[in-house]
């Protein structure tokens, strides 16, 4: 039994040797620039102030959702997608300045967006209509998956 155990451990040790070093296609490191309820730590101005230092170590920074949610939120219940980028993390101008500073310091920006998380204006299916680059977007009750909650959403949509 000891021989079998020793052989197994020896095989595992040799497998681990292959995992050392950088992958052949390695091209950078990404930093998650936020955590849950990190409104002050992840403000656009706070992240921008760190851009020179972050640029020394990271190639990408993953930032939280930037759309307006109508209140203090991490952004996963966004109300506006195209027309209002004043979020819990700062204004649209501050966001644009952050992205510009990141680019100047060799950092790419990745935004965290969950498309199917929407906040409504007043009722269950009352989403704002927005126009972006001449195209008007309107989310209706029929745009919500009928089976994502056991049919409850479809029943509500059918009442509309």
Predicted stretch roles:
Residues 1-4:
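Positively charged n-region of N-terminal signal peptides that target proteins for export
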């Amino acid at each position: 039994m000891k021989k079998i155990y020793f052989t197994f451990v020896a095989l595992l040790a040799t497998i681990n040797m292959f995992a050392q070093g950088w992958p052949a296609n390695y091209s950078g490191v990404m930093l998650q620039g936020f955590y849950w309820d990190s409104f002050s730590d992840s403000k656009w101005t706070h992240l921008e102030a760190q851009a020179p230092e972050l640029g020394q170590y990271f190639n990408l920074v993953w930032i939280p959702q930037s759309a307006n949610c109508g209140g203090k939120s991490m952004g996963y219940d966004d109300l506006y997608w195209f027309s209002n980028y004043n979020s819990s993390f700062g204004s649209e101008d501050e966001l644009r300045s952050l992205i510009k500073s990141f680019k100047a310091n060799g950092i790419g920006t990745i935004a965290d967006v969950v498309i199917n998380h929407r906040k409504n204006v007043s009722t269950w299916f009352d989403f704002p209509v927005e126009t972006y680059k001449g195209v008007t977007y309107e989310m209706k009750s029929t745009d919500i998956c009928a089976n994502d909650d056991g049919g409850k959403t479809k029943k509500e949509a059918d009442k509309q």
